Amino acid sequence: MILGLEQGNLLIDTGPDLRQQLLREKIGLVHGVLYTHEHADHIFGMDDLRLFQFYLGHAVPVYCEPNVEQRLRQSFDYAFTDRKQTHRGSIPQISMNTISTAPFEVLGTKVIPIRLYHGPRFKVLGFRIGNIAYCTDTNEIPEQ
């Protein structure tokens, strides 16, 4: 899912077919990424963020919980080391921002994380952004 906010495009999760989805929808630039949780179908497209660093002029800001960051660093270790690039754009540049369930701001917009569960115990985040609520892979939404 991508939201066109006042200060740019905010992507939620990077599925393995991210590149095809962005091309199909004619999305030319992603200004930031929120992650709901660390399952493969939500993170395995992170490598496709590599082109956006050129257009932005800086690393792509990513917002996630510590467990998601850990999985991203394991799965895409080359993006988080001081490895020399073999050619321009060969390694995505990511700026990690740790979040919790406290509200925060991205691209000039308030984001309210919502604690959800994927099954009985696996924690995921949903997000309330303006009048939109994005809740994925959940079996229950709390009253508050």
Outline where the language-model segments fall.
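Binuclear metal-dependent hydrolase catalytic cores
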Residues: 1-135, 139-143
